[in-house]
């Protein structure tokens, strides 16, 4: 789910800010031109990219830049906003939007992109929220929190919102898929709910299915994404067993 927050450039110290290329990725670079004590300066910060559903696996360059400037620049609304409500968090606690449920765990907030648009500086957030929560309620809670803490003129807006795809792990099709994984790997792990979008959105009543094998690093959507050849071969056997069981039931 994509959110945006716009700040008037005149209320900030920035002449220009640019960071991130995709909202659903933790940005690995950010550059800002800003004014301090009558001088114009430029700061560039590097981070580590990560998928937007797991921002904690990266180092957010936008947040790092704002954090570095917080001790240098005063009277800058955008920096004050980050210092008060974003910090280096990924769970939305200081923003007033921290939520969690048993089925899918806590929400994640990825500060995915920042750019200068005309007279505004626009911040974009990739939010992955739990399946039992309503996005409108979360956004209203955030805006109320901002208003109560001196930022009544700053509003979070929804850009896009795709409905959740969720199926209870106890339904027959999930148990069939899970049995194929258990039998082929010997790993008795339970199924996992992920925050990313998959082909399961294409049709009703389907789920994305694939192994997250114990001890393996998750590198999807990151630089140098890879899979062990042995794991790929094992995945083939899992899929083969799963398909046989699905068509025979």
Where do the PLM segments sit?
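Short amphipathic alpha-helix segments
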Residues: 1-14, 32-35, 88-106, 140, ...
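Fold-level recognition of mixed alpha/beta catalytic cores in primary-metabolism enzymes, strongest
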Residues: 1-63, 223-228, 234-235
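Short beta-strand elements
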Residues: 5, 32, 36, 45, ...
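Short, conserved charged micro-motifs
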Residues: 38-42, 132-139
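Hydrophobic residues embedded in beta-strands of well-ordered beta-sheets
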Residues: 41-43, 119-123
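A common structural junction motif
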Residues: 42, 73, 144-151, 246
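An extended, acidic, His-containing surface patch that forms the Zn2+-binding/catalytic region
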Residues: 53-118, 137, 153-249
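C-terminal catalytic subdomain
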Residues: 121-135
């Amino acid at each position: 789910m994509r959110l945006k927050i716009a700040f008037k450039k005149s209320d900030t110290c920035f002449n220009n800010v640019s960071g991130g290329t995709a909202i659903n990725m933790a940005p690995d670079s950010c550059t800002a031109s800003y004014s301090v004590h009558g001088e114009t300066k430029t700061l560039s910060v590097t981070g580590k990219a990560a998928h937007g559903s797991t921002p904690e696996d990266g180092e957010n360059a936008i947040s790092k830049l704002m954090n570095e400037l917080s001790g240098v620049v005063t009277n800058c609304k955008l920096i004050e906003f980050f210092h008060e409500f974003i910090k280096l968090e990924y769970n939305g606690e200081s923003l007033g939007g921290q939520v969690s449920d048993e089925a899918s765990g806590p929400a994640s907030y990825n500060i995915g992109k920042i750019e200068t648009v005309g007279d505004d500086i626009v911040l974009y957030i990739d939010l992955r929220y739990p399946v039992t929560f309503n996005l409108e309620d979360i956004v209203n809670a955030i805006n109320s929190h901002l208003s109560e803490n001196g930022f009544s003129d700053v509003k979070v807006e929804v850009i896009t919102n795709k409905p959740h795809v969720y199926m209870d792990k106890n339904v027959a099709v999930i148990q069939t898929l899970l049995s194929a994984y258990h039998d082929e790997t010997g790993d008795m792990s339970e199924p996992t709910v992920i925050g990313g979008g998959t082909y399961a959105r294409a049709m009703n009543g389907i789920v994305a299915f694939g192994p997250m094998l114990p001890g393996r690093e998750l590198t999807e959507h990151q630089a140098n994404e890879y899979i062990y050849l042995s794991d790929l071969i094992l995945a083939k056997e899992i899929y083969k067993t799963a398909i046989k069981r699905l068509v025979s039931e």
